Design a protein with these regions (language model features):
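N-terminal extracellular ligand-recognition/capping segment immediately after the signal peptide
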Residues: 153-157, 170-197, 202-213
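Right-handed parallel beta-helix
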Residues: 222-233, 261-276, 291-308, 319-336, ...
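Extracellular beta-strand-rich solenoid/capping regions of secreted or surface-exposed proteins
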Residues: 185-198, 209-263
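Conserved aromatic anchor
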Residues: 63-75
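C-terminal accessory segments
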Residues: 442-482
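Beta-strand-rich modules
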Residues: 106-128
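Bacterial Sec-dependent N-terminal signal peptides
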Residues: 1-6, 15-58
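Extracellular fibronectin type III
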Residues: 29-42, 123-145
């Protein structure tokens, strides 16, 4: 369902507003705590359900939950509320149902989701009030507001070259909607400059399709997000996303004096399927040294076809402060023998003890990456206390050297902060958990040792059949939801 069909959007409030709203959980059925008996204003009536105009949705500060409240209906005996996820309008999914003696309730909140609330006022036998004959239906969503919609069949390079589609003076987050299931092309480079830009399908459930032409790239020196897109890279060997060759000096030396350009807003790949990747997923080009504060690959499938490709290639002198791969599958059709990620910058150069470099792999499936090679190619940060590594609940097959952890850390040192839990280290048909030895490596004793037994990796099916992996549901969770 296209989010624009909804007439109401959620209101995001933080801190005090959220706390105040949660206090609305008192009983909204009329009552009086004094000594005298009290009667409600409404008796011997058929009640109405709360008016949609008075319903409010307030997100928690971290966005993980929300409080939904409505105006009191006098004489009510309570309310029956049903909250649905309607991303697929033909198959609503019940999120929460409750009979409530109050005028609010809490529910989990998902990003980029269409919701429908149905609420009915219940009767009150004591005062002979009957329940409402009709329920109130209230639609809302958790999408970032749309700046412009891009028609199906558009060449993005041509479209963004037209006046007004990328306003030079805008300081807002520019969110562009592509039609769900629509087809789009990128015939040449687009440099979004310092704009914070999101390109997305307007439906979380139905990706738009984007074909990258020969030599075409998406460039930025600001925050940038690709969401819910199927991206075909077969025609190009260039980086899908490249840090701009012409960054503005306004983002230079925000910390320290080492001439780094700082990208403060996140660069995100979310809900994307990237096929036939023959160039880097992201590279730093020739625009100077960058510090990318946040780089995230979340809920993605990335297929690599180049056996010498470095997918995360920041070799000009750049690095990422916080790099995370989460709920994703990244694989090579043939055994890739290059590093998976390469930085050539380091926090130490900023002369600030608070600067960190974090690398995390969470609930992800990695296959045939950096086979018999170092998973991380850089050595400039070896042995430094600024390093943080997290590998948890991942299935790692034919990646790195026999000691995968060492090929990731590139050091035998107690300096970095590390966290491991329930990973599979499988290589050349054998469990390699016993090889994860040395300072900083996985010695938690939590590794899973059964063959993950992917159903058909050659066809891109990484559903595990190994008993321990199935029991623990490790790796990319999508394979358990087929």
């Amino acid at each position: 369902m296209n989010k624009k069909n909804y007439s109401h959007s959620y209101k995001l409030c933080a801190g005090i507003a959220f706390a105040a709203c949660t206090l609305l959980t008192w009983s909204c059925a009329d009552h009086y705590d004094g000594d005298e008996e009290w009667s409600p204003q409404k008796q011997n009536s058929t009640l109405l359900s709360p008016e949609a105009e008075g319903i409010k949705v307030v997100a928690s500060p971290d966005g993980s939950s929300m409080t939904i409240s409505w105006p009191v209906v006098y004489g009510a005996g309570g309310y029956a509320a049903f909250l649905y996820n309607v991303n697929d309008p033909d198959s609503p999914v019940l999120v929460k149902s409750d009979s409530i003696d109050g005028c609010s309730f809490n529910a989990t909140r998902e990003e980029d989701t269409n919701y429908m609330l149905k609420i009915r006022t219940l009767g009150n036998v004591k005062y002979n009030n009957k329940e409402a004959q009709e329920e109130t239906v209230f639609n809302f969503n958790t999408f970032l507001p749309t700046f412009k919609e891009i028609p199906n069949g558009t060449d993005l390079t041509t479209w963004f070259g037209e006046a007004g589609n990328l306003p030079e003076d805008s300081t807002s987050h520019l969110c562009y909607d592509l039609e769900p299931g629509g087809t789009y092309t990128l015939s040449g480079n687009i440099d979004f400059g310092g704009h914070q830009v999101t390109l997305r399908s307007s439906s979380k459930s139905f990706n738009a399709k984007l074909t990258i032409g020969s030599g075409a790239k998406l460039q930025t020196w600001g925050g940038f997000t690709l969401k819910y897109l199927d991206i075909d890279c077969a025609q190009t060997n260039k980086a899908l996303v490249e840090l701009s060759t012409t960054p503005d000096d306004s983002i230079k030396n925000l910390v320290g004096t080492a001439n780094y350009y700082f990208i403060q807003d996140p660069i995100v790949f979310q809900g994307c399927k990237v096929s036939s990747l023959n160039g880097a997923l992201i590279a730093d080009g020739e625009g100077g040294k960058y510090v990318v504060r946040t780089l995230m690959i979340n809920d993605c499938i990335v297929e690599i076809i180049n056996t010498s490709l470095i997918p995360i290639s920041l070799r000009t002198g750049s690095y990422v402060t916080d790099f995370t791969v989460k709920n994703s599958t990244i694989y090579s059709l043939e055994k890739n023998t290059a590093a998976f990620l390469q930085y050539n910058g380091r926090p130490k150069e900023l002369n600030d003890d608070s600067e960190k470099q974090c690398i995390s792999f969470l609930n992800s499936t990695l296959y045939q990456l950096s086979y018999n090679a170092n998973f991380r190619g850089d050595t400039r940060t070896q042995g430094q206390k600024s390093n943080y590594f997290t590998v948890e609940r991942c299935i790692i097959v034919d990646c790195g050297k026999d000691n995968f952890c060492q090929s990731l850390l590139r050091q035998a040192s107690t300096n970095p902060t590390v966290s491991y839990s329930k990973n599979t280290y499988w290589k050349d048909g054998e469990d390699k958990s016993a090889n994860q030895t040395g300072a900083g490596c996985d010695q938690t004793g939590t590794a899973l040792t059964t063959d993950p037994g992917f159903i058909n990796p050659a066809a891109g099916n990484f559903t595990p059949t190994g008993s321990q992996q199935v029991e623990e549901k490790t790796g990319d969770p999508r394979w358990f939801n087929q």
